[in-house]
Amino acid sequence: MDLKLALVSAFPPGQQSLNEYGLHLACEMAAREDVSEVVVLADRLPAPRTELVLDPKIRVVRCWEFNSVVAGASILTALTREGVDAAVWNIQTATFGDRELPAALGLMAPATARLLGTPSGVIAHNILAGIDLENTQLKGQRLRQAVIRAAGAIVTRAMLAATYTTVTLRSYLDHLSAVFPNKEVHLVPHGTFDTAAQDIIPVENRPRRL
């Protein structure tokens, strides 16, 4: 079965966080024999730039803007238009914006996509619980920090409502498993797909070296 997959991610030559990870992920997805096309639903560039030359199986559709409250809706529209079999969301807390509302609305889109019929897997590179708000622009703002954490709990629950959720740090896995014991969360460390698995050569069959 040939699969048409979507990858929602910041993507080069853009400068947003996780763009290089998105590139490597798209290439690994396209390398699979059971994948016919990878449609990258990427962030729009602030100024025209030359797009990368990619594998013929990879097509980039720049359909959402950073800090836009309609970024999630734009992605959902693109998923429907493209008719993909499934979507992978390569995201972190500030993927869709560095302001609270656009960031939160964007992070709730994977669960919405699933409800609309597109199986959606989330690769979460960080979670709000792992961020020390005292080391951000919210330092000393106790009330606002409390509001952000409450909203963050709602957003995290929404992210866990995707078809599957993976995290890249053991501490995130431990936290989510403790707070949401009924949710299935997987650990996929950074760099897992960088090199293909290789058979280990038995010591006795290896060439002798000085």
Regions found by a protein language model. Give the residues of each.
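Helix-loop-beta element that forms the nucleotide-linked donor phosphate-binding surface
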Residues: 157-161, 173-192, 200
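Short N-terminal targeting/anchoring amphipathic segment
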Residues: 61-62, 76-104, 118-121
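Conserved nucleotide-sugar phosphate-binding/catalytic loop shared by glycosyltransferases and other
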Residues: 48-74, 78-81
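N-terminal subdomain of nucleotide-sugar transferases
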Residues: 1-46, 56-58, 82, 115-118, ...
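Membrane-proximal helix-turn-helix segments that form the acceptor-binding/catalytic region
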Residues: 107-115, 143-164
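Alpha-helix capping/helix-boundary segments
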Residues: 46, 128, 171-173
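Conserved donor-binding/catalytic core segment of Leloir-type glycosyltransferases
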Residues: 204-210
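Acceptor-binding helix/loop patch of EC 2.4 sugar-transfer enzymes
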Residues: 120-148
